[in-house]
Amino acid sequence: RQLVEFLLRTGSIDSRFTGFDRANEGARIHRRLQKAAGEGYAAEVFLSGEREAAGIPFTIEGRADGIFTDEAGVTVIDEIKTTAVPADDIAEDMNPCHWAQGMVYGALYGRQQGLEKLDVRLTYYQIDTDDILRFVRHFTLKELEAFLQDLLEQYAPWAQRQLAWKEQRGVSLSALDFPFPAYRPGQRALAGEVYRACTAAPSKSGVRLFCQAPTGIGKTMSVLFPALRAIGTGCGEKLFYLTARNTTQSAAEDAIARLRASDPKLALRSVTLTAKEKVCLHPDAEGHPACLPELCPYANGYYDRVNTALKALLDDGTGRFRSEERRV
């Protein structure tokens, strides 16, 4: 799903159709439809396959909402989608991502089972009226495989970029030096415990560490520095530093800035997650985010622009990227 949505996403952000409650409701409807489909309907089928594009090996994984055999003996991949779009406006080609997701599952399942042809069915459930609409398309395995291969070829430049970045980051972080002339009392011991926790067996997956230290010891750097060094040795991909207050958030940002200042060539990307109420570029009259395409120029057509903006952000290593210029 992530592969398909990353490459094929289009349209606008619309807060009316997103959110935690909406996702939970969608999951409940999925289970209801799957249960009603009967005994011959296999729900939540895990699929995995190995492919290669541009010399890069890929492992594609996902869960098909349902797989069954129809009356003609044809295997059908069922993709269920809940929607708030009025039933009269639901069209077969409403969202290319929906078909693409089912087609990728079809390619994986078809090769796995040695099938020559498969059908993909989209099942739309209208959440306000309980209407159910279904659309079916017929494919050969060759067509589905070609579609998946084309997606991977499109994604390959992004994968190459990420692989190159990981290699650069690993070399940089593994050689990271402590950014101060000396450790404070107790700071080295804490940093050592953090590093051992991050690199502990099995398979360098780490263990839990609970620690308590007095104010002024330099806890932020004592945690960030060894954790980043551990990432440089292949232990983990991302570091999440959670804070309860803005003051401790600033301490983490200052520590990252200090690390960068001590090594101008440091290969490190950091992101501060902030409530959208605080960073919204186009709030409504009451100062609240208005994530509706008809009200916000940033929400309108957002998914048509986001990948171009993301590439520009990754290409700009100086942090001068401005979302206003890209309207994202």
Where are these regions (language model features)?
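Mg2+/Mn2+-dependent nuclease catalytic core
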Residues: 49-146
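Metal-dependent nuclease catalytic cores that hydrolyze phosphodiester bonds in DNA/RNA
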Residues: 1-70, 74, 100
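Conserved pre-motif I regulatory segment
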Residues: 165-211
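Polybasic (Lys/Arg-rich)
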Residues: 143-175
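A substrate-engagement module of RecA-like helicase motors
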Residues: 170-173, 177, 235-327
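Phosphate-binding Walker
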Residues: 218-225, 246, 250
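The conserved Walker
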Residues: 215
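Walker A/P-loop NTP-binding motif
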Residues: 195, 220-235, 255-259
